[in-house]
Amino acid sequence: MRLPIFLDTDPGIDDAVAIAAAIFAPELDLQLMTTVAGNVSVEKTTRNALQLLHFWNAEIPLAQGAAVPLVRAPRDAASVHGESGMAGYDFVEHNRKPIGIPAFLAIRDALMRAPEPVTLVAIGPLTNIALLLSQCPECKPYIRRLVIMGGSSGRGNCTPNAEFNIAADPEAAACVFRSGIEIVMCGLDVTNQAILTPDYLATLPELNRTGKMLHALFSHYRSGSMQSGLRMHDLCAIAWLVRPDLFTLKPCFVAVETQGEFTSGTTVVDIDGCLGKPANVKVALDLDVKGFQQWVAEVLALAS
């Protein structure tokens, strides 16, 4: 039986690969997509998500979400993904539009209609998820779990300690981590290992139309290089759903720093239980890299 999922995203070049996997992995049933400001503005992430859905002829409803963080000024990652978020490929024009309600309400409505609890996957800042949990707490029993790409038990990638998705809206992340729902965190501990090799990247143009499109986008992606390999951060959240055996997880207490001058956005991961607090997050700490690379090749071969 396919696993029903809702995907909250901020495309973003590596988001495009994660979306492909969510659509084409035979184990998954992607039922709803929502967008959030993150890598670029929410108008751009929505446009990019609709372009991808049209490219793959995927009839999946999409709702536009939060344009700004809960309490602070927005930041983006255009330096990594380009000004548009997905430069490098000329997508065909289309007339698709997002559905006419905010993302967190679209998630609420879809959860309440679902015949069974649904897995939420968030691969951008957690603003929409925080709005859902704070404004619609009645939805919690209908959430099977939340799988996120975000955080780190050590070094960051946008500050010395903070990972971008958490640092973009620390208050939202703090709200989510305090919510009591089951959370799996695929952070930089594993995503920095999730590298597509130059040899594999060179085969993409001959793989299929998706391979050609991704190869064009990758030429503008700044999380690595075509010569040294590219990190597939967001794809790890999808990979865990399909191949949890590739990941080493540890239940930990995790809190989000929202006040520090130099540490705001840091995920404080209590690996050794120093704080004596109960675990609230299953933290991915290691990855079977070869197995991950093999799975990526298999799923992208299906993305015709």
Curated annotation (Swiss-Prot):
One of its GO terms (molecular function) is purine nucleosidase activity. The active site is at H233. Keywords: Glycosidase, Hydrolase. Signal peptide: none annotated. CDD domains: nuc_hydro_IU_UC_XIUA. Belongs to the IUNH family. RihC subfamily. PANTHER family: INOSINE-URIDINE PREFERRING NUCLEOSIDE HYDROLASE, NON-SPECIFIC RIBONUCLEOSIDE HYDROLASE RIHC. This is Non-specific ribonucleoside hydrolase RihC. It comes from Shigella sonnei (strain Ss046).
